[in-house]
Swiss-Prot record:
InterPro entries with a match to the protein in the record: G_TrmE, GTP-bd, GTP-bd_TrmE_N, GTPase_MnmE, MnmE_dom2, MnmE_helical, P-loop_NTPase, Small_GTP-bd
Details of cofactor binding: Binds 1 potassium ion per subunit.
Transmembrane segments: none
GO cellular component: cytosol
Protein name, UniProt field: tRNA modification GTPase MnmE
Coiled-coil annotated spans: none
Length: 450
């Protein structure tokens, strides 16, 4: 069991509220709580009492003691439910510190839960995901990860992989046997099954990352092309000022929306043009910088000639900025103001036709965005995932392909080695083998009281 010092923190969000919760965890949690309350606390009982600093009453509320290991962290845990005034809560924190506790670091309660085997690393990450979920589907998916769906899939895969690796190694360890184990159809079928499962998990992880982290869309284009109108149309509200004056948007405007439950972070940028205006020029610099961070760029244009669509690329429309835009970035050309055309072309490839002002073609654009980012699975059975999960699964997938090659070549030792590498990558997902640096990075992203 993880039994270092005793930690304390406010577990509820900052600000005023009806109730504020303070969490204490560690070997001295009960002793500290009994000093604060001057009560003997029974495990799993709600005790209504005063909370003191020495002999001065700070507040009164409900105190619950969770005896190890039947607690969130696996240690002795006490939760004090007081009035949700920040000044009151901070006074209780100070009193707990005076009794020997220390302030918890970000995510330290969940880190202790992980180190005490109350949950694995994917479940620990799901705690943060469920707190930060920005859509209903994302919240449900995070809940599935928290209850262990993702972990079970990885562990079932590991079980099959380890069994196969042991079988292969047995063929290496007993060369005197006249049977060629590598020609055994059992190995071929088992390896093929593992390959297919890893491929399926790889695809699920990609969907899970989209739900957990969302998609960043950047709206760029020349001034007055309708970027702000498009932002408002996608958001379904007036998020940006729209005028006929070119250069109205001079800074970054952000909006968070959902498209079919997928979180989208939309950023409207200053129109790209050479400008003598200092503020507008700074906005254009920021726009170029944001383009480099985008998952997808929506290049908004109203470039028509004689009421006909002109198929120009970025190099033609804004040649002065072309060299500053990454060449590998995914760009969709959004042809706005189609209400001005006599005949509207059909959407094709990366060209979508809309009228932001009249809300024409917006649903088709949303559908196009989801397809471009690769979100196809809207099944509620999907779980959330992180970029590190995707990296680990991608690496495992590459090495399982190498394992298949070694099997075809009859190289038993190299086959076993590739299977071991796959196993290590899968273990890193659930935290079976994780470096201190990785753990520090993961838990530091949590809020203090979790």
């Amino acid at each position: 069991m993880y039994t270092k010092d005793t930690i304390v923190a406010i577990a509820t969000p900052q600000g005023n509220g009806g109730i504020g919760i303070i969490r204490i965890s560690g070997i001295d949690a009960l002793a500290i709580a009994e000093k604060l309350t001057k009560k003997q606390l029974k495990p799993r009982y709600a005790t209504f009492c005063n909370v003191y600093n020495d002999n001065e009453i700070i507040d009164h509320g409900i105190v619950i003691f969770f005896k190890a290991p039947l607690s969130y962290t696996g240690e002795d845990v006490v939760e004090i439910q007081a009035h949700g005034n920040p000044f009151i809560l901070n006074l209780i924190i100070k009193a707990a510190l005076n009794c020997g506790a220390r302030m918890a670091k970000a995510g330290e309660f969940t880190e202790r839960a992980f180190l005490n085997n109350k949950l694995d690393l994917t479940q620990a990450e799901a705690v943060a995901d469920i707190i930060n979920a920005s859509s209903e589907i994302a919240a449900k998916s995070a809940a599935k990860s928290l209850q262990g769906d993702f972990s079970k899939e990885i562990n079932n895969l590991l079980e099959k992989l380890i069994y196969l690796r042991m079988y292969v190694e047995a063929s290496i360890d007993f060369p005197e046997e006249e049977i060629n184990f590598l020609e055994d159809q059992k190995i071929h079928s088992s390896l093929e099954e593992i390959y297919k499962v890893i491929l399926a998990v790889k695809n699920s992880c990609k969907q899970g990352v989209i739900l957990a982290e969302g998609i960043t869309l950047i709206l760029v284009g020349k001034p007055n092309a309708g970027k702000s109108s498009l932002l408002n149309a996608l958001a379904g509200k007036e998020s940006a000022i729209v005028t006929s004056i070119a250069g109205t948007t001079r800074d970054i405007v952000k909006e968070h929306i959902q498209i079919n439950g997928v979180p989208m972070h939309i950023i409207d940028t200053a129109g790209l043009r050479n400008s003598d205006d200092i503020i507008e020029s700074e906005g254009i610099k920021r726009a170029i910088k944001k383009i480099q961070e985008a998952d997808q760029v929506l290049f908004v244009t109203d470039d028509y000639t004689n009421s006909q669509v002109k198929f120009s690329d970025i190099k033609e429309i804004i040649p002065e900025f072309y060299d500053q835009i990454p060449k590998d970035i995914d760009i969709t050309y959004v042809h706005n103001k189609i209400d001005l055309l006599k005949e509207v072309p059909h959407n094709h490839a990366n060209h979508i036709y809309i009228s932001a002002e009249n809300n024409i073609g917006i649903d088709k654009l949303k559908e196009h965005i989801l397809n471009k980012v690769g979100y196809t699975n809207q099944n509620e059975s999907i779980y959330t995932a992180r970029e590190r999960h995707v990296t680990a699964i991608n690496n495992a997938f590459e090495h399982i392909k190498l394992a298949k090659e070694q099997l075809e070549l009859g190289n038993g030792e190299l086959l076993a080695e590739e299977l071991l590498i796959v196993q290590e990558y899968l273990n890193s997902i659930t935290g079976e083998f994780s470096s201190d640096d990785l753990l520090g990075e993961i838990f530091s992203s949590f809020c203090i009281g979790k």
